[in-house]
Amino acid sequence: MNLPNLSLADFLPLLPAIIMVVGASILLLSEVFLSTTASRAYQAVLTVVTAVAAGAMALTTMFEPPQEVMLGFGVMDPFSSFLTFVVCVGLGLATLSSVSFLRKRGAERGEFYALMLFASAGMSLLAMSNELITLFVNIEVLSLSTYALTSYLRRGTRPSEAGFKYFILGAFSSAVLLYGAALLYGATGTTHLTAMAGPLSTAMSSQPGLVYAGIILVITGFAFKVAAVPFHMWTPDVYEGAPTPVTALMSVGVKAAAFAAMVRVFFMVGKGVDPQMLLGLFSVLAFLTMVAGNLLAIPQRNVKRMLAYSSIAHAGYLLVGVAALFVTGPGEQFRLLGASALTGGTPLGLARAEALRGILYYLLAYTFSAVGAFAIVSVLERREDEEKGTAWDLERFSGLAQRKPGWAFAMAAFMLSLGGIPPTIGFMSKLLIFQAAVDAGLIGLTIVGVLSSAVGIYYYLRVVVYMFMRPVPEGAQALEKSWSTELALVLSTAAVVILGIIPGPIMGWLEQASSIFGQ
């Protein structure tokens, strides 16, 4: 039997994920030696250091030429490196916000941070996946970790209920995705994405039904992971029931990894099938997700559920960018939702690169804004009110500007960014997405996106009004200081404001990460 010939060079591109797995293993071993609350603080420090090291390692590979690793089952390129960096940013900020959250509940244990690292390693590997079975395995690595994290808190029924719902629906969606992958394998005879285009083109002539069924099932599986309508039903309950720092990591990390895998899979698949079908499917998903997410968020007084529906809406904006990847160039006419020919003679490769650049920038912007917002939510909630469902009521934010001006300013920045209001990073990210859609000729979809974004501003500004224009509630308890949470807020707020005003520092990274579509 011939064994695969693996060398050290095959593992070097995997260093970010390896660093996270090693860090998680050290945390699990540390449980044997650490027993006091003070000593457990070092577990959070180790997690943050691991996230920084993995993120820095990902950045060092940003400008390396693309190369297949692990016998072609993965690919290291600027695209996967940037997504790994985004995941590490979300991991580090979510870890900082979890320290005081866990301490107040007496739940500081090494396995919490270890699961965060295992989930993030799965996200990183998912962004690199270049083969369908490897992709499925990495989805399960991150999913199993997030299932456990969702039900981590053992007091009350909400975490257990949320974890159970997430597990059942997540397992169902994984089965759907795997079935779709099996159909694509049956049509092409390969599971490697880079080798799939030619056989798919042939299969479209002989057995188109099999190909279409496989594509639709794979899209359905991904749609669940990114919380796209109508596969979003799990999101509000799971986001509400999970520990708030876990909700923060899920909302940004899972979304980033799933979109990375979705883009890579369908960029390769799109070379062998009619791109008009993919354009139509993703346009419909984007339309439904933007509209439903924003409309369902309006009546919410539970801020955690409001942010959950907001997350759905943001998935819709990202799907606009995904749809723009499948406009095939001048002379093609797509009328769905107002799509027309590629405008202005924009070169096809440039149009796709613009769309991908918008997606990547949006994921980074959403990471800083959403994790920061959930960090504020985590420090305002009280453990005794969680089971009653009042821990995340909008009234918690009343008079926050008088009690904690710094926190109120940070939350206002996050809300403005999520709403896409200048001069925040959220405005720049939406501008890039919608500009790419306009350049691709998706005029109707862009109009729907802009109008949906305008609707979303209402419920974001409502939080700001409560913080700055409502009095402090009678009997309001003093708010505890948390150095780790405040550090996360400072970093997130600085990124939201500075990168909104001066986006130049990361534009070089975005240009490099989107270059795989510039050919």
Curated annotation (Swiss-Prot):
Keyword Transport recorded: yes
UniProt subunit comment: NDH-1 is composed of 14 different subunits. Subunits NuoA, H, J, K, L, M, N constitute the membrane sector of the complex.
Protein family according to the UniProt entry: Belongs to the complex I subunit 2 family.
Extent of the signal sequence: none
Transmembrane parts of this sequence: 14-34, 44-64, 82-102, 117-137, 167-187, 209-229, 249-269, 278-298, 307-327, 359-379, 407-427, 431-451, 487-507
Name of the protein in question: NADH-quinone oxidoreductase subunit N
Entry GO CC: plasma membrane
Keyword annotations: Cell inner membrane, Cell membrane, Membrane, NAD, Quinone, Translocase, Transmembrane, Transmembrane helix, Transport, Ubiquinone
Enzyme Commission number: 7.1.1.-
PANTHER family membership: NADH DEHYDROGENASE
Membrane topology listed for this record: Multi-pass membrane protein
Catalyses which reaction(s): a quinone + NADH + 5 H(+)(in) = a quinol + NAD(+) + 4 H(+)(out)
Compartments it resides in: Cell inner membrane
Pfam families named in the record: Proton_antipo_M (PF00361)
GO molecular function: NADH dehydrogenase (ubiquinone) activity; NADH:ubiquinone reductase (non-electrogenic) activity; quinone binding
One GO term of the biological process aspect: ATP synthesis coupled electron transport
